[in-house]
Amino acid sequence: MESIIQQINQLRTSLRHHEHQYHVLDAPEIPDAEYDRMMQQLRDLEAQHPELVTNDSPTQRVGAAPLDAFEQVKHEVPMLSLDNVFDEESYLAFDKRVHDRLKTAEPLTFCCELKLDGLAVSLLYENGELVRAATRGDGTTGENITANVRTIRAIPLRLHGDNVPRRVEVRGEVFMPQAGFEQLNEEARRKGGKVFANPRNAAAGSLRQLDPRITAKRPLTFFCYGVGLLDGGELPRSHIQCLMQFKAWGLPVSERVKLCTGSDQVIAFYRQIEQDRAGLGFDIDGVVIKVDDLVLQEQLGFVARAPRWATAFKFPAQEQITQVREVEFQVGRTGAITPVARLEPVQVAGVIVSNATLHNADEIERLGLRIGDTVIVRRAGDVIPQVVGVVMEQRPDDTKEITFPSQCPVCGSDIERVEGEAVARCTGGLFCAAQRKEALKHFVSRRALDVDGMGDKIIEQLVEKQYVENPADLFQLTAGKLTGLDRMGPKSAQNLIAALEKAKQTTFARFLYALGIREVGEATAANLAAHFRTLDNLRAADIETLKSVPDVGEVVAKHVMNFLSEEHNQKVIEELEKVVSWPEPQQIVVEEIDSPFAGKTVVLTGSLTILSRDEAKDRLTALGAKVSGSVSKKTHLVIAGEAAGSKLAKAQELGIKVIDEAEMIRLLGE
């Protein structure tokens, strides 16, 4: 079981990182296919071990969090993502699941549409007028991009017709046609400006401009594909008729939509679109297949992060052949050593590819890869390249073996690989400049100490100029030193000093999360903070005491122990304690609390609509409850919100009491 927990935790950590890179930073590091593989592997493991499912698992969420630069918008109806299938066998399995759940053997009618490769947005119309536009964000909260969306001429500022609902929120995709993308990049090259890697990145970057005048100059367009909120009106009872209604209101809808009855017609449509893909004039990465009857959609319902009545049938990644020139090794925040192949540049799906991730030593061994080999490079999801195979018959005589380093290429510290883990790591910790940069970026991030304005470029300069070696050094910075950085004037420097001053007041949970202890995410940091209450108590804890904390197992307990016992980390924490502070937590004496939650282990599952999850946790904890992320025999109560999944099923299986959010609110008020 320990190796399963370790594998699950490792997958969650990797997926969270790559979600942030893709959805928040628009800087993905791995192919979509690799992300999908990891997500499916995690889903499979959690299905086999439902007691290990936690609220903060990537399988229980849609996407990633919004940026701070824009006002946040809470979606009244969550914007869910779609599950994916990658071949005909997987699609037929989806088709069978739908038939089985509906208890019918008759062929079903599906509405098949293009899967656009852009940015999902929500458009809210009140009395026919566009009043708000928002990105998907994490599915619950997005970014208010109304001013930018109003500049997109394809989007009507007012709906047409007499039957417009009082309030209607439509969903669709903002994207950049290929011709406009090429023209934008050509102009950028002439001016020596930023060139975008692909149309999706260009669309995302254009929508996230703080100045709408810049967005207005970008060749963006939009297709509508669904509805979220509807108030004061009616829609047809089939999806394709809804699309026609959107079109009648003046909303753009793709012409490549088709009703298909039975799996043979669906697969034929998929193959036809795959064949026509290159001539569409805009990027797609598959076909979306939806049960057309809205009554049947309601019967099928949802799982935690996606509807049961729809799936995305994705195209195979596009591939080309090239040669490996060299292999270099990069170092991440936790010391993970990632081999990267430097390739003979080759055009794959319209983009010049010169680098590809090799993931780890096991992947190199699996491929049988050598320097000088001819390899197959795939751009999964048309975004990120990876080496998927070696063309052995083209191997030259002078290839070189790839030697995985035993010392860190940045700091020279030993590299170790823990038994059972695929990832090798530098043991240098914050002594390693590469780890220092990534650790500092994490320390100042929004969910950690939230130092507003302290971006990646600033961190990199601070480390390179040796102004900062560890997080404690950040609080010794002066405006004078900061003004010596690129693009840092006196006012910006003063603002950054003020942001650092503000960050000194935090919470124990945020502080623990900011330290960057392996496997300690926000939820685990909050549990550790609630359990130990002070740093001294946490320092004094042994493995068994740590394991008594909700969601902390053997692996996480060892990571915490190792981090706190390392001499360099101890010194950094001591320095931080001199400047960073948080409110002294009040001692909660459970026996003195008159509450139905006192002394109970409580699990929250599904989407809450009245309170946010954080608010619910805070109020439950204040009334003496221990809030856990997983259901076990020790759980006393499960609070089930909308679209509750495996945790609810586990609770019912174990005979644990289940209440809904309304009942929780009533009990909180007693």
Curated annotation (Swiss-Prot):
The active site is at K115 (n6-amp-lysine intermediate). One of its GO terms (biological process) is DNA repair. Keywords: DNA damage, DNA repair, DNA replication, Ligase, Magnesium, Manganese, Metal-binding, NAD, Zinc. One of its GO terms (cellular component) is cytosol. Its cofactor is Mg(2+); Mn(2+). SUPFAM superfamilies: BRCT domain (SSF52113), DNA ligase/mRNA capping enzyme, catalytic domain (SSF56091), Nucleic acid-binding proteins (SSF50249), RuvA domain 2-like (SSF47781). Its EC number is 6.5.1.2. NAD(+) binds at D32, A33, E34, Y35, D36, S81, L82, E113, R136, E173, K290, K314. It catalyses: NAD(+) + (deoxyribonucleotide)n-3'-hydroxyl + 5'-phospho-(deoxyribonucleotide)m = (deoxyribonucleotide)n+m + AMP + beta-nicotinamide D-nucleotide. It comes from the Bacteria. Residues 592-670 form the BRCT domain. Belongs to the NAD-dependent DNA ligase family. LigA subfamily. DNA ligase that catalyzes the formation of phosphodiester linkages between 5'-phosphoryl and 3'-hydroxyl groups in double-stranded DNA using NAD as a coenzyme and as the energy source for the reaction. It is essential for DNA replication and repair of damaged DNA. This is DNA ligase. It comes from Yersinia pseudotuberculosis serotype IB (strain PB1/+).
